[in-house]
């Protein structure tokens, strides 16, 4: 499952709940900056922050939280619940 959202200027962001694969798009004129590890740290005015494991933990004002298994459990105000097999069984709320 992929969770997608966009900021007020039209930049799109997404994260896959199990693999934690993070994707983004920029708009014309955006400068892309990278951290020492080579990860994107800024897309225009949007800052990207990572946890110690290298997983995205914040995109602008949207926080991303993980469960013990390392699966995404929250993206902003969107909550994700899994069954014992690791499949998404329920989502509630919205990202923003």
Language-model segments: which ranges?
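Repetitive, compositionally biased segments used for assembly/scaffolding
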Residues: 1-96
């Amino acid at each position: 499952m992929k969770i997608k959202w966009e900021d007020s200027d039209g930049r799109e962001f997404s994260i896959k709940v199990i693999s934690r694969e993070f994707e983004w798009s920029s708009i014309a004129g955006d400068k892309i900056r990278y951290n020492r590890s080579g990860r994107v740290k800024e897309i225009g005015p949007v800052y990207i922050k990572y946890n110690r494991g290298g997983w995205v933990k914040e995109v602008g004002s949207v926080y991303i939280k993980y469960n013990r298994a390392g699966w995404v459990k929250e993206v902003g105000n969107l909550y994700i619940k899994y069954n014992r097999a690791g499949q998404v069984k329920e989502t509630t709320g919205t990202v923003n």
